[in-house]
């Protein structure tokens, strides 16, 4: 819906109607407001002339360090600190969509996708239609449209919330990345619930240190107007976060600390999933779930905490849990029965790989086999760490390519190799498709095979090109072929 330019930027010398907002000059159409900000790869101000040529009605640009501007009849508005204001500007344009929603923000190194999808499924079952914004895309559970970033840009976030609200959402479960918090992509949103899963090494190529990474995550828990914080006490940083005084309600959860608001005892992990006694100030209840692994029990507690924070009764929440499924590519089960059990998981950090391998060990009647690689152009420090973890926790390890991006596959594998104490016992096979086929073909019926790193991804990025590739499809093909040699 068009909006007056002066409603967005009162300092504009001339008022006119704005049809849409855009940060990308390539997508400008007549009547749009082009927002020109410096970015990591491109400076939007270098594309002002292009935006004007395509019919931009006006341009707002970052004033600091701006060079000479092209001549224009359209208003050109200089704004100091424009990037930090984008979320608020977009909020005004799209009618402050977060204000009329129960907005649940989920942050942490691992578990964001699982927790947000568990919350969304549970709310749907409880009668509150819930949208999703995150790594697997945006939309409603079972019908997500894929996106490139965990937390979209500030304009896309607000536009997405407006679209979801218009489509009937009364709540939205949003993955909130450290990048998104640090860059102000969610700055003007009205979060009701903030969930913290865990903090471990990741994104140090961007943040520079664990302290900076932690500080970015912590912003969500001091959010203005926040109703409830849901925090994992089994995490060192979580305990620190829970100890900080805030106005919002605090719900803590733990698998080990009986003083937590939500605490599990007598947890049992079997082929049917998870069963545990949930102890809370509201009383005890039986938690049942088809999900696999200890960390998924932690994810379930995070989801229960968010739902309690929204005011749902514990009994109603527990009744939804047996119906909740894990996301595609997150501890996803393939095969099993008269074939090896193959598990596809997105684990691409040392902490996530360790948790997945530990979670799968009780399910392996025989060997636990692990395939992994590391992404190119990303934190190289985690490569040897992941090697050491795989060597310690798996019976057999196969190292392959992940997304090499613009980095040489051989260089990535050489970094990984440094972490093995006995690299001669490890198989190195760069072609991921061949590696998956080889490992599954070598598995026995009682073995568990973990394919780690890519999860839901339907591509492999090599030399900047995304080629169609799916671990799930490759595994299904290998399992079908497994019948022949093992029949």
UniProtKB/Swiss-Prot annotation:
Q: Which GO terms describe its biological process?
A: cell division; cell wall organization; peptidoglycan biosynthetic process; regulation of cell shape
Q: Which UniProt keywords apply?
A: ATP-binding, Cell cycle, Cell division, Cell shape, Cell wall biogenesis/degradation, Cytoplasm, Ligase, Magnesium, Nucleotide-binding, Peptidoglycan synthesis
Q: Which residues carry this modification: N6-carboxylysine?
A: 217
Concerning InterPro entries, the annotation shows: Mur-like_cat_sf, Mur_ligase_C, Mur_ligase_C_dom_sf, Mur_ligase_cen, Mur_ligase_N, MurE/MurF_N, UDP-N-AcMur-Glu-dNH2Pim_ligase
Q: Which residues bind meso-2,6-diaminopimelate?
A: 378, 402-405, 453, 457
SUPFAM superfamilies (alphabetical): MurD-like peptide ligases, catalytic domain, MurD-like peptide ligases, peptide-binding domain, MurE/MurF N-terminal domain
- Molecular-function GO terms, alphabetical: ATP binding; magnesium ion binding; UDP-N-acetylmuramoylalanyl-D-glutamate-2,6-diaminopimelate ligase activity
Name assigned to this protein: UDP-N-acetylmuramoyl-L-alanyl-D-glutamate--2,6-diaminopimelate ligase
Q: What's the source species for this entry?
A: Pseudomonas aeruginosa (strain ATCC 15692 / DSM 22644 / CIP 104116 / JCM 14847 / LMG 12228 / 1C / PRS 101 / PAO1)
Taxonomic classification: Bacteria, Pseudomonadati, Pseudomonadota, Gammaproteobacteria, Pseudomonadales
């Amino acid at each position: 819906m068009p909006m007056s330019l002066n409603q967005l930027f009162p300092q504009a010398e001339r008022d006119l109607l704005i049809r849409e907002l855009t940060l990308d000059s390539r997508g400008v159409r007549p009547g749009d407001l082009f927002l020109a900000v410096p970015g990591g790869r491109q400076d939007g101000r270098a594309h002002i002339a292009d935006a004007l040529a395509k019919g931009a009605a006006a341009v707002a640009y970052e004033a600091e360090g701006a060079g000479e501007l092209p001549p224009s009849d359209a208003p050109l508005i200089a704004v100091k600190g424009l990037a930090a204001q984008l979320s608020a500007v977009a909020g005004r344009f799209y009618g402050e969509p977060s204000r009329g929603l129960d907005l649940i923000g989920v942050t942490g190194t691992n578990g964001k996708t699982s927790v947000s999808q568990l919350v969304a499924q549970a709310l749907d079952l409880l009668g509150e239609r819930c949208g999703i914004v995150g790594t697997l895309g945006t939309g409603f559970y079972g019908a997500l449209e894929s996106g490139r970033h965990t937390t979209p840009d500030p304009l896309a976030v607000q536009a997405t919330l407006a679209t979801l609200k218009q489509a009937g959402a009364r709540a939205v479960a949003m993955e909130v990345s450290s990048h998104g918090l640090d860059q102000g992509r969610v700055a003007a949103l009205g979060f009701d619930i903030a969930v913290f899963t865990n903090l471990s090494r990741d994104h140090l190529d961007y943040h520079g240190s664990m302290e900076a990474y932690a500080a970015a995550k912590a912003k969500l828990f001091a959010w203005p107007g926040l109703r409830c914080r849901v925090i994992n006490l089994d995490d060192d940083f979580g305990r620190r976060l829970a100890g900080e005084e805030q106005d919002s309600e605090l719900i803590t959860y733990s698998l080990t600390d009986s003083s937590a608001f939500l605490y599990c005892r007598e947890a049992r992990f079997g082929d049917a999933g998870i069963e545990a006694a949930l102890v809370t100030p509201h009383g005890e209840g039986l938690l049942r779930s088809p999900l696999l692994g200890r960390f998924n029990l932690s994810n379930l507690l995070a989801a229960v905490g968010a739902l309690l924070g929204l005011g749902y009764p514990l009994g109603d929440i527990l009744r939804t849990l047996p119906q909740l499924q894990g996301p595609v590519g997150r501890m996803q089960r393939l095969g099993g029965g008269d074939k090896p059990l193959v598990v596809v998981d997105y684990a691409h950090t040392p902490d996530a790989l360790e948790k997945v391998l530990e979670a799968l060990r009780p399910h392996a009647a025989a060997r636990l086999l692990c395939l992994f690689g590391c992404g190119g152009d990303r934190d190289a420090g985690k490569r040897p760490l992941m090697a050491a973890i795989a060597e310690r926790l798996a019976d057999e390890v196969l190292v392959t390519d992940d997304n090499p991006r613009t980095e040489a596959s051989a260089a990535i594998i050489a970094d990984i190799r440094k972490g093995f104490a006995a690299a001669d016992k490890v198989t190195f096979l760069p072609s991921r498709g061949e590696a998956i086929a080889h490992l599954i073909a070598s598995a026995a019926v009682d073995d568990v095979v973990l394919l780690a790193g890519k999860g839901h991804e339907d591509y492999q990025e090599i030399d900047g090109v995304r080629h169609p590739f799916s671990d799930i499809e490759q595994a299904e093909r290998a399992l079908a072929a497994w019948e022949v040699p093992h029949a």
